[in-house]
Amino acid sequence: MRMDKLAKTAKVALAAATFAIDRPYTYRVPDALAEKLVPGMRVLVPFGAGNRPSEGLVLSLADEVPEGRLKEIGTLLDPRPVLTQEGIRLALWMRERFFCTVYAAALTMLPTGLWYVLRESYAIAPGVDRETWEEKTARSPKAKQIMGLLYAAGGQADLDQIKAIPDLKDPRATLRELEKAGLITRQTQAKRKVGDKTEPIARLTMDPAEAMALLAPKQKTSPMGYRVTELLCRLGSASVKELCYFTGASRTTIKSLAKKGVLALEEKEVFRRAMPETGEITPLSTLNNQQQAAYQGLLDLMEEPAPQAALLYGVTGSGKTQVYLHLIQKALEAGRGAIVMVPEIALTPSLLQIFLAHFGRQVAILHSCLPTGERYDEWKRVRDGRAKVVVGTRSAVFAPLPDLGLIILDEEQESSYQSESMVRYHAREVAKFRCKQHKGLLLLGSATPAVESRYAAETGQYHLFTLQQRYNAHQLPKVVLADMKQELRAGNNSGLSELLRTELEENLRRGEQSILFLNRRGNSRMALCSQCGEVPTCPRCSVHLTYHSANGRLMCHYCGYSMPLPEVCPHCAGRFQFVGMGTQKLQEELQALYPDVEVMRMDADTITATRSHEVLLDRFRRKKVPILLGTQMVAKGLDFPNVTLVGVVDGDLSLYADNYRAAERTFSLLTQVVGRAGRGDKPGRAIIQTWTPDNDILNLAARQDYDTFYTGEREMRRLLRFPPFLNLFRITISGPEETQVLRACAVVRRSLDPWIKPRQHGPEGPEVLGPAPAPILKINNRYRYRVLVKCRNDKEIRAILAQILRAAQQDRANKGLSILIDVDPMDG
């Protein structure tokens, strides 16, 4: 937003500010930047008593200068705004909603390629010779060490080099003294993680006829130059790479022509593409009656002048994606953009191919596994209006579409839509805010909607649309529960029941494919000494180590610690046995049973390189690999017509977790994975192996009876006062000293009493639980305790919690502690 008058001051959100001191800081705008500076740009500014350089985001500009001395903006980092006015409003809203700083919220919206790294360096001041600095540092060994390093390094060194000086723990105080004494100067450079990609382009500088006349006499002596000129006469301009390829000329020839003035060379921005170029655009398929009814109702909402929200509840394979495609087509016809989010990166390639087939180059992809350069370029394509359909995971909700008409959350119940990084946002809440800003439609899609979403539809907060049958009248798979207790009594102690083994062999005989689901990676859950019962545990975390047969090591899945598997127990010299099966062990068992059959494994250990999930799924599809084994990556969104059997190896795994959402998560996961079978013309079967075959949740999942499950779960939540009836705020404090963490938790708990006690009566009265240890007390040498607040999520409680968080961060007794607040955490 350009001002009529030149800007004199700017309100800036700072990267260096913690939540406790986060507010807009006022800085003077230097004359050199007065015409360039725009809200949404980033700057370098001095901050604090030591005037340390900090990145900042310009929030607003003013042409008035308040009284008092102001610090001045140092460097402009961006040639154009990285956030729009909507983005700035969103960052301010996220600060209030998710207890983060404005700058952290802004950074969350940007691709990492746009992030800056500040490099601080120091140099010997001009005019300071060796004799001078040796004399002035004679009484300070630390200062003498630093000056000696700078001298040996040619007069300049960065902060990391200075910190590496032996026995010099914290050099900052000494550096400030040297700077104050005029012996050194400080410089800060801001370097971006990735730059814009360009390539040299050649264009004629004269009329084609004139160029050919100039080069004609040299056709024999300089044939390559003549060919290049001839090609440019036809094309007008071309990349240097293309000119060299089609004419056989070298870059030296092209530079020579540029020197002669025949052509000019300039750099043109090009995009690193995250996807292959598309062929012909495929027309949309015809919707069946129930899809058409849902589509028409949703289209009416999308064309409303006010923001709308809807839930599309459809059984697995009912064709929700086709409804999405038709709605996106209508949004594009209206000149508006659309965002489609999926919970797993593994789901992106298959969905992307569908969208590319229908919308071609209008599609952009945004997720964290893209190479930094590709992700940055895709973001630019969206920002510049070259792509209007964005497909991606959670972070795609921030795609800078200028006119956003539709946001779709597919599999909206998934916990991966909630961030566990520095800003603890939920993509659904951000999507609501953005749809409100753009007056667009938020569409939540699922075969097993979150209890909160289904309740919102039931109470009129969302519009509800249903798809009760599979597309093309395909039947839902037939599901059977296999009792593993009976298997054990019959002498079968393997990971596969007799029933599942029989069905697998039947599929192999028919040439049909099978998916096996086991939500535990590694070989075995733990190693156990058969004599003394010793279990190797992680020295940094309060968890046992998981055995990985691929490298023969015991590994911690929380901090990354690993150790070789001991040959014997270090306590009693007994032998280790392995308890609990993981995907590696199941793969070994399957390969022993069927040595001539390929078993493909898909988990966090096999999905390591960029796009490795795409490669695996493409091989499974094209090569017709008989068995795909994996963790929850294989449970959702995969659509392979030749998959007719799904086996759930351990249906109880998530059912008894220490989490009020355990039943919901188990039901959803089982329903989703079972739904991978029978999506083509052949009927599907599914087998759920369990130790508790009478469990209601497992039986409802086997029947895919979501409505009965929802009714019971809703009543349980009402009685226990869990979401959607009350909200949860979870305050987690972690640190290296357990007593310090407990003390901080106790202070936070007491700080809530003045607000809680007058309000705690009645069905919606607030309640505080804790302090209590987290389910895993210690992770990476940091103890974790929690305080849980049950109440309505309104401005009053958010303001009180923000005040408590500021006080806790400013309490010197809490030095070294991390204090986080999660709103309605998905992990309970």
Describe the residue ranges of each PLM region.
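Accessory, non-ATPase domains that flank or precede helicase/AAA+ motor cores in DNA-metabolism machines
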Residues: 1-446, 458-474, 788, 795-828
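Short secondary-structure junctions
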Residues: 18, 594-597, 752-767, 811-816
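Active-site phosphate-binding and catalytic loops of NTP-dependent enzymes
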Residues: 99-108, 185-189, 303, 515, ...
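A general structural signal for alpha-helical elements within enzymatic catalytic domains
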Residues: 151, 167, 356, 505, ...
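Inter-lobe coupling/hinge segments of SF2-like helicase ATPases
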Residues: 278-288, 292-293, 299, 305-732, ...
